[in-house]
Design a protein with these regions (language model features):
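C-terminal catalytic-base region of ester-bond hydrolases, centering on the histidine
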Residues: 189-283
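Short, solvent-exposed loop/turn segments at secondary-structure junctions
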Residues: 30-32, 66-67, 102-104, 136-138, ...
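Short aromatic-enriched loop/helix-cap "lid" or pocket-rim segments at secondary-structure transitions
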Residues: 38-39, 140-146, 208-215
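Active-site catalytic motif of lipid deacylating hydrolases and related acyltransferases
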Residues: 20-95, 148
Length: 283
């Protein structure tokens, strides 16, 4: 209901006096990407979502080094550069940002710190809202495990990386400090200047006898089933539900909007179970 009301308010605000140019940006999660279109999101996801645009060319797939701390030039600086270029060249004034995992933290840094970089205010102004898929807003215990260097590190390195700055940042205790001092949108903090809508994956399906296990890659879902054992019962194998809902506002839990289907952390960046259609219709 709140999401619908927000959309109505935006429409009333835009009015009919001028036309807007809508665009969509796909912002990847932890790690360095050079071809996130093919490697992170995959074409089926991107090309399905952008069908919701009046001009399907008005999209950008971000490629940055999110192995760095969120505020660095390689992370938020890189994101600001690519978003600014996109907004400027395509004349975008109604930007929907779709983030996944740690990408939500990088985008939230921009929204929370408009004076940190002279480009941030224009990005914030152009942004309609952020659709934050499985954001690690309160960190993840898996980052704690990797940084502690225990034997579990070998099992999650493929997913999270090995003791990078971004992994250090996503330790639960570190994110608590950032949320209390540097980032907006969590409980007890001022609201973000634009909507930050959480899409929450709440379970992992990995049975070889269940066809749901194969969407996005069976072996990846099996790996997330293993990592889920380290997390709360409500998790996507990487992010606990409490972390995914820690900042901004809840949009939906997977099974409530996808016909009872669950999204693992891998599946929530792919065209699985109609997620792409929900995101498309939001544009």
């Amino acid at each position: 209901m709140f999401r619908s009301l927000a959309g109505i308010v935006l429409l009333l605000g835009f009015g009919s006096a001028f036309a807007t140019t809508t665009g969509v940006a796909f912002v990847h999660g932890t790690g360095q990407q050079t071809d996130a279109y093919n490697d992170y999101w995959q074409p089926a996801m991107v090309n399905s979502v952008r069908q919701g645009l009046a001009n399907q060319a008005n999209y950008v797939v971000i490629n940055c080094d999110f192995g760095q701390y969120m505020w660095t030039s390689g992370a938020a600086g890189c994101l600001a550069t690519q978003l600014t270029n996109f907004i400027t060249t395509k004349h975008i004034d109604d930007l929907v940002v779709i983030t996944h995992s740690n990408g939500g933290n990088v985008m939230r840094w921009i929204l929370s710190n408009p004076t940190y970089d002279s480009r941030y205010p224009a990005i914030i102004k152009a942004t309609r809202w952020v659709n934050a898929i499985a954001p690690s807003s309160a960190g993840t215990p898996l980052a704690n495990a990797v940084i502690s260097g225990n034997v579990f590190e070998g099992a999650v390195g493929w997913l999270l990386g090995y003791q990078s700055d971004a992994v250090r940042q996503q330790q639960t205790s570190w994110m608590a400090v950032y949320n209390a001092n540097n980032l907006l949108g969590t409980k007890g903090r001022p609201a973000l200047p634009k909507g930050f809508w959480d899409v929450v994956g709440s379970d992992v399906v990995s049975s070889p006898f269940n066809s749901d296990s194969y969407c996005g890659g069976y072996t990846l879902n099996v790996g997330l089933e293993v990592t889920q054992a380290w997390l709360a019962s409500c998790s996507d194998g990487f992010i606990e539900c409490t972390s995914a809902t820690a900042a901004g506002s809840l949009w939906f839990y997977d099974h409530n909007s996808l016909g009872g289907k669950y999204l693992s952390h891998n599946q929530s960046r792919r065209a699985c179970f109609g997620l792409d259609v929900v995101l498309r219709n939001d544009l």
